[in-house]
């Protein structure tokens, strides 16, 4: 998949340590879970001839938001984001689909391996099933958001999943092989860091290319670029900051984070309504 190749090519410039993946298998999810993990309800969703786990937090009957993982998997940071989303305004029901089927990376090499092996078309089907589950279980409207790999999938869902009512994507764009953003059906808001070095995937050039495609689509859209910010700038927990620094990403900008969340809130409130 071209989206994965773009991200992997840029990630090859990051510092790597040999991962235990290649000798002893993945670490269990608990190794990455925060204390907040207990707030989630674990549910199994069936699509076609397979099932997958999702993690749900927030008020029943509230508008829903499907929250898509970074290339690490369903770790503490995507759970932090989902909890935050569930508490915005009058509240949302946030749902994280486990696209990696229980695997979580602890090192960049693991994340590369997992993302390279992702069935991207299958992930789109997981997203569609997640959106449908929320709508069938009390959410009148459902949006999709995602980060890095999940950001690319979020944009793709706005093209390929007709049940999606709104999208907010963070630092990720899909390849034309996965989804042509000029054919978007849902309103899309996207956020990028000015200093993002993931060329062709999340850098300024990719952001501007996405904006041109969204203009051509005719859907409501916004593309925001944050000065002085690099990749994954929304990740602000102590654990995430340590991990970012290990990847050479040393910027911290709480003002940009607050502004992005404010824009997220306004966008989802506009298209999903309030609980």
Task: Show which residues each predicted segment covers.
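Primarily recognizes the serine-hydrolase "nucleophile elbow" in alpha/beta-hydrolase
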Residues: 128-185
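Serine-hydrolase catalytic machinery in alpha/beta-hydrolase-like enzymes
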Residues: 2, 27-138, 236-250
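Acidic catalytic loop of the alpha/beta-hydrolase fold
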Residues: 195-205, 231-232
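Short alpha-helix in the alpha/beta-hydrolase fold that links the catalytic acid
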Residues: 80-81, 200-212
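Short, proline-enriched alpha-helix->beta-strand connector loops that line the catalytic pocket
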Residues: 183-188, 218-220
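N-terminal chloroplast transit peptides
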Residues: 1-19
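Short beta-strand/loop motif that positions the catalytic acidic residue
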Residues: 184, 190-192, 226
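C-terminal catalytic histidine-bearing segment of alpha/beta-hydrolase fold enzymes
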Residues: 215-275
